[in-house]
Each structure stands twice: as structure tokens, then as C-alpha cells.
């Protein structure tokens, strides 16, 4: 429902400042309130297990979910609240032709102009129209906002999210994440060199980079250090045969003015070395101790002191905000990887290289305690590939959750011609092939499987009818409110989601007196969805002393 903004109208008709609603610095757009509401609106959906597409269903703790990622995130909220260690997403970059989600909030131009306050209800223009394409930014913001908001709920307190983006929306993405995650939780804006080869557009810049915005959920996060290479160690040498090994010289000056650290240093021959303007880095007593241990030495003419930083004292290296393609891979490397996996066919445009996601995992995870990695714009499933690769290399036990909308492939594409009718088919097959390749190359004993789920309508019938809509013949159909095509396993997954149980928990099925009984994580949950369960079966289930029991009725 549209309404007149009287405060704005008063200001437009006045040549002096009109008191009204207090202004504040914020990111806003037409449709933001609906986007916020959309994040909190419940859905009548569930996840259904697809065992035929899964690999090692009984033992795997990895997951692949087909469906709208907003719906999937909402369904995962109870089970994975505060449990995800790392999120990586590569969302649509808002090129004008990549909107494929149901909640795109697309507005006609005239409606956008009115909602954004550029005209009144009579069509009179209030300000010059400088935003003819602004509605596309609004659509994109409204699509991303609820997804990022729910994603934050899934992160652990020490969790981190990495977001790939390009120049078109990096500014809006930064402001939106500042609002959702908090500006104090902004970690870095990394520049990734996605291309090395020049594009050769004369008169224009050849663009070779994208961005990766990094946010923590809270200040409890900590980044892992990166491994050092020969390139990083080449500045270290041992010209004086120090028994502590290679070293390089370090700064001895204080960065801030410290009058209590201003003092002269006397050399072994009695010379005086005056302090730097801000003072030394340490107290006089500490300097004397470092001189006695050889950590601080004098140059040959005793005019200055040299501090030694030993290579053996360094634990890895700090990450930098520029990631070069030669270190983490480029888009061309991502294409080559897919080409190798799919027998020289490239079924996906611009896949991210495995090395890029590995770098993200190296920084945000350590492979211990079954850390969960989530990618809800998973595309060709590079993130799943990277999780298996790094687990094979360091013996980690990271688990992945991939979410992807089953977007149809173009009928003229190599993917379609190869039999992959949607992106999910590409992603699942990529995981299967990558797992086979990694296992053959490394022989590592890791989780190579994944459980497949599909977002679907609720397992329950809609039995809430008004009396005038209900016919007498319908009464028999309503005797059971469970849809006829749903199985006991469908019902089990819905119950697990409602109870907040992880879908990676071990599941087992047994037969008790002809009735199918489902066990989740031993006796954490026991469920039977058959009709007419006997008292004897109930007593046998009770003897297991389950934490939770669910029956059909």
C-alpha cells in the first residue's frame, strides 16, 4: 500500500530546514523492509533424502542440497545454528541477466521511481532521475540480504564468511555486510587476481581482479597462519654462523614516542649509540639481556645495533590482502581442473580454482573437530572439491554442505550436450569424479561421500480448511495428514530438522515385528512411522531408553 511521505513533501515545499524524522547514515533501498521480513518469514517446506544420487549415504557426513538457497538456509537454521566454521559464497555479480531466484523483488521502472521517492503519486518528478538502473541494485540487495542474515545465524562465534564479488556490487555488498555482521567484524577486502593474460581492449583497462570480502561473526575469530615458502625465506641467512640458524635484521625503533625508552647504549669498546627519536623498542634491561644472548649485535664500526629475527621462531606467515593467480590459481586454472575431470569438456562457466578455496580453508579452519564448511551458491562444487583435497593433504576432518538451485543448463552448452540438464547434476558429478581422483592420487582415508537432499513441499497435507470449502467426501482423505508419496525416511528427515538434529548423524533402520524403526545416532532419536504399532514394539523401543521417540500418530 502506497502512502505520502509528508515529511519529504514538507521539505520539498520549503526553503528552510523542516524538522522531521532523525536522519542517520545507513544503506537503504526500495524493498529493504520486505527483504528483512523475508529473512524472518517461516516456510512450509522440508528436505527430502535422495539416496540414489548420494555416495556412501550410511557413513558420509557431507551434504549436497538441491533447491533455493534461502529456503535451504531456513530449513537448516535449527540443526546448524552456531555450528558452521567457514562460509564461502560466489553469488551472482548482478550483471543484469543472472537473477534466477524466486524472491528477486523485481520492480517496474515507474514503480521503482515512485518507491524511491523520485515522484509523487500524481507522477510529478521530485528530483532528477539519476538512477535509471537503480532498481537492479535494489533487486540484488533484496535477494542477498535475507540470505546473508540467515548465514550469520549459522556461523559459530569464531566463524568467518568469505564473499566473492566484483566491481559492480562490491560497495553495496560491503555496506550490507557492515550492517548484518557489524563493521567491527570486518576482517579484510582481498584482491584476487583471477586472470593473468591481458584482454587487449584498447582504450580501456584490462580487468584482472575480483574481491573477496571477509567478515567474522564476532571478535572470537582467529585466522590460521599460512605455510612459508622458499620465496618467503630468501631474506634469511646466517653470515655469522649463529647456532640458532638463519636470521634477518629487524627494526629496533619504537613506533610511538616513549620517553622512558630514550637512553644511550654503550658498546663493548665504550662508544655511545644515541637513541632514535621515539626511543628504543625495549627497556635498557631487556636490551642488555638480548645483547648477552646474541639476539642483538653491533655492526662492525659499532655505530648501530642489529636485532636478529630468527627463521626458527616464526610460525608460518600472515596472510596478505593481494592473492596472486600464480599462488592460488586463476579462472583459467579452474576451467582446466574441470576439463581434466570431465574428459576435456568444460560444463561450467568461470569456475573458481580449487587453490583459491584451499587458501580460504587454510586461513579459516585447522581440520580438527569436524569443522563445517558451507557454500550456498555452490555452482560446480569447487568448495566440496577443495574440502576433500585439503583433508587428504593434512588429514583433517572438515565436512561440507553445498547448496545449489537446479538451474537449467543452456541447450546449446557443452554441459547440456553431455547430459547435464541442470547445474546440480554438474556439481554432484564433479564431487564424485574429484573424490575418485583424490583417492587414487593420495590414498588418504577421508570422507569421499555425500548425502543428497532436495528442498520440497512439506510432507504434511494442508488440512486447515474453512467449513464452506470442505466436502463430506474429503473427510476420508483427511484421516491421515501425511502425503501419500512420502516415505518414512522423508518423515525422519523432517523430524530431525524440527528437533534441531544434524542431518549428518548416523542413521540406521531395523525391523521390529514387521515394523520399520529408524535410529538416529544410536538412541538419540528412535522413530516409527508405520500404522498400528503394537504395544510389544513400543516396549522394545522403550527398552532402548531413547532420548527422543516419534510415532506417526
Annotate the PLM regions.
Residues 124-139, 185-188, 199-200, 359-370, ...:
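Cysteine-dependent PTP/DSP-like catalytic domain, specifically the C-terminal lobe
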Residues 216-343:
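Active-site-adjacent helix-turn-beta-strand microarchitecture at beta-sheet edges
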Residues 144, 156-158, 167-226:
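Signature of N6-adenine DNA methyltransferases within the class I
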Residues 498-517:
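Conserved helicase/translocase motor-coupling segment
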Residues 1-88, 93-146:
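DnaQ-like (DEDDh/DEDDy) 3′-5′ exonuclease domain used for proofreading
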Residues 81-160, 168, 209-210, 224-255, ...:
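SAM-dependent methyltransferase catalytic-core segment centered on the flexible catalytic loop
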Residues 69-72, 76-79, 143-148, 154-157, ...:
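Phosphate/ATP-binding catalytic cores across multiple sugar-kinase/actin-like superfamilies
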Residues 370-379:
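Conserved class I S-adenosyl-L-methionine
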Amino acid at each position: 500500500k502506497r502512502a505520502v511521505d509528508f515529511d519529504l513533501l514538507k521539505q520539498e515545499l520549503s526553503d528552510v530546514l523542516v524538522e522531521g524524522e532523525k536522519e542517520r547514515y545507513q544503506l537503504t533501498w526500495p524493498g529493504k523492509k520486505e527483504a528483512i521480513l523475508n529473512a524472518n518469514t517461516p516456510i512450509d517446506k522440508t528436505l527430502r533424502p535422495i539416496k540414489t544420487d548420494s555416495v556412501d549415504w550410511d557413513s558420509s557426513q557431507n551434504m549436497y542440497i538441491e533447491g533455493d538457497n534461502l529456503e535451504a538456509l531456513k530449513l537448516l537454521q535449527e540443526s546448524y545454528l552456531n555450528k558452521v566454521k567457514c562460509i564461502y559464497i560466489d553469488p551472482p555479480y548482478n550483471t543484469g541477466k543472472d537473477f534466477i531466484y524466486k524472491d528477486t523483488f523485481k520492480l517496474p521502472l515507474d514503480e521503482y521511481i515512485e518507491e524511491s521517492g523520485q515522484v509523487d503519486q500524481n507522477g510529478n518528478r521530485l528530483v532528477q532521475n539519476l538512477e535509471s538502473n537503480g532498481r537492479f541494485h535494489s533487486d540484488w540487495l533484496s535477494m542477498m540480504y535475507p540470505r546473508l542474515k540467515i548465514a550469520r545465524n549459522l556461523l559459530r562465534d569464531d566463524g568467518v564468511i568469505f564473499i566473492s564479488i566484483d566491481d559492480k556490487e562490491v560497495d553495496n555488498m560491503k555496506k550490507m555486510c557492515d550492517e548484518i555482521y557489524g563493521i567491527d567484524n570486518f576482517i579484510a577486502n582481498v584482491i584476487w587476481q583471477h586472470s593473468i593474460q591481458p584482454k587487449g581492449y584498447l582504450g580501456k583497462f584490462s580487468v584482472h581482479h575480483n574481491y573477496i570480502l571477509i567478515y567474522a561473526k564476532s571478535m572470537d575469530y582467529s585466522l590460521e597462519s599460512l605455510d612459508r615458502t622458499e620465496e618467503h625465506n630468501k631474506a634469511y641467512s646466517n653470515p655469522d654462523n649463529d647456532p640458532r640458524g638463519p636470521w634477518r635484521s629487524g627494526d629496533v625503533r619504537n613506533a610511538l614516542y616513549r620517553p622512558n625508552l630514550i637512553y644511550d647504549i654503550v658498546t663493548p669498546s665504550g662508544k655511545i649509540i644515541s637513541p632514535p627519536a621515539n626511543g628504543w623498542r625495549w627497556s635498557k634491561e631487556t636490551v642488555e639481556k638480548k645483547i648477552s644472548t646474541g639476539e642483538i649485535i653491533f655492526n662492525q664500526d659499532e655505530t648501530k645495533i642489529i636485532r636478529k629475527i630468527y627463521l626458527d621462531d616464526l610460525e608460518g606467515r600472515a596472510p596478505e590482502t593481494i592473492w596472486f593467480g600464480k599462488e592460488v590459481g586463476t579462472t583459467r586454472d579452474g576451467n582446466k581442473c574441470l576439463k581434466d575431470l570431465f574428459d576435456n569438456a568444460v560444463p561450467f562457466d568461470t569456475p573458481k580454482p580449487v587453490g583459491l578455496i584451499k587458501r580460504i580453508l587454510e586461513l579459516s579452519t585447522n581440520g580438527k573437530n569436524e569443522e563445517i564448511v558451507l557454500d550456498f551458491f555452490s555452482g560446480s562444487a569447487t568448495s566440496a572439491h577443495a574440502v576433500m583435497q585439503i583433508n587428504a593433504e593434512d588429514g583433517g576432518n572438515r565436512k561440507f554442505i553445498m547448496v545449489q538451485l537446479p538451474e537449467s543448463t543452456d541447450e546449446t552448452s557443452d554441459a547440456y550436450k553431455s547430459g547435464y540438464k541442470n547445474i546440480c547434476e554438474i556439481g554432484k558429478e564433479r564431487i564424485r569424479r574429484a573424490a575418485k581422483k583424490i583417492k587414487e592420487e593420495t590414498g588418504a582415508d577421508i570422507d569421499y561421500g555425500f548425502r543428497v537432499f532436495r528442498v520440497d513441499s512439506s510432507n504434511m497435507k494442508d488440512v486447515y480448511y474453512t467449513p464452506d470449502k470442505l466436502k463430506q467426501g474429503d473427510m476420508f482423505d483427511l484421516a491421515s495428514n501425511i502425503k501419500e508419496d512420502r516415505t518414512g525416511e522423508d518423515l525422519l528427515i523432517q523430524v530431525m530438522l524440527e528437533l534441531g538434529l544434524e542431518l549428518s548423524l548416523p542413521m540406521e533402520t531395523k525391523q521390529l515385528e514387521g515394523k520399520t524403526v529408524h535410529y538416529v545416532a544410536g538412541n538419540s532419536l528412535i522413530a516409527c512411522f508405520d500404522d498400528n504399532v503394537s504395544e510389544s514394539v513400543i516396549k522394545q523401543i522403550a527398552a532402548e531408553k531413547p532420548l527422543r521417540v516419534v510415532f506417526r500418530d
